[in-house]
A protein has these predicted regions:
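Structured catalytic-domain cores with a bias toward divalent-metal coordination
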Residues: 1-292
């Protein structure tokens, strides 16, 4: 996130793109279900009473990356901006894949409401992870070294079922069903990709990095498609994700990144903007592992 002055500059850029250039969404280097809670708050669709509550979903380290005063200010600003816009309200979404278990719960919550039989099938498939509790690294280690069977077939089957039944499931939850299904479907995609990601962490770094940024690019593509032809998305992430890896040592190591994939996909419709400094030091957090 960087120093407060850098964040303040970034806030001015984001708010200017929204108010002056009519950007329609912010997609952040944040976990999908946690960011979607903010999306519901700023679009007047959720149950949270204030921005502090909306940010409370961010529990995973480093929670302070998103649960801080600067993000709080931006979330409050975005809600105020949307207040008198009864249509085309600007949304807030997450691109990252570290929320495997939260995403499983989100899929099950959606299916419980629209199709209990499908929910039972999903619970049976996702029970493959039960032996590991919430410890995704234990799952990655055990499956990476062949100590236990992976859940690959189960998560792919669940995602494919939701894709296959998209039209049916999206019609079952009333007028907001399209957004509700999209949220659930992206959580199922996240579970599928995270299942592959965690074992890769115990092998070469290039593999896990590429899986993560490819997931971000897939999620961004899905979001753009969901928002429609007028979508204009601000992507909020670290320089290492947003630059074009082909122009750096990353590319020489065989790494790709979100900026590269977006530029390859959207060409001149994508503009990559990064922050750098000439000299000095930056404090990213006042307390690295202190509670928010």
């Amino acid at each position: 996130m960087g120093h407060t002055s850098s964040i303040a500059c970034a806030h001015r850029l984001r708010s200017g793109l929204i108010t002056e250039k009519e950007f329609t969404a912010v997609a952040a280097e944040a976990d999908w279900p946690d960011a979607y809670r903010i999306n519901q708050y700023v679009r007047f669709e959720g149950d949270d009473e204030d921005a502090i509550d909306a940010l409370s979903g961010f529990q995973r380290f480093p929670a302070w990356m998103w649960r801080n005063a600067d993000v709080l200010d931006f979330v409050g600003w975005l809600r105020n901006y949307n207040e008198h816009r009864h249509s085309h309200r600007v949304g807030f979404y997450g691109l990252d894949l570290y929320s495997l278990h939260a995403s499983i719960r989100a899929v099950l919550d959606f299916l419980d409401k629209v199709d209990p039989d499908a929910a039972r099938r999903a619970r049976y498939r996702y029970a493959c992870f039960d032996n590991y509790g919430e410890d995704t690294q234990a799952y990655g280690y055990a499956t990476s070294f062949g100590l236990n069977k992976s859940c690959e077939n189960e998560v792919i089957s669940q995602w494919m079922e939701m894709r296959r039944r998209a039209a049916d499931l999206a019609r079952r939850d009333g007028r907001d069903s399209r957004d509700a299904f999209f949220f659930a479907e992206q959580n199922a995609r996240l579970v599928k990709n995270a299942e592959e990601y965690y074992p890769s962490m115990f092998h070469e770094r290039v593999s896990s990095w590429n899986l993560r940024d490819t997931h971000m690019a897939e999620t961004l593509d899905a979001l753009v498609h969901h928002l429609g032809p007028t979508a204009k998305v601000i992507v909020w992430a670290h320089n290492s994700h947003l630059g074009d890896a082909r122009a750096t040592e990353m590319g020489q190591r065989g790494e790709l990144n979100l900026g590269q994939l977006v530029r390859q996909r959207y060409g001149k419709d994508a503009t990559l903007v990064g922050f750098t400094t000439h000299s000095g030091t930056v404090t990213a957090a006042s307390g690295w592992d202190s509670p928010c």
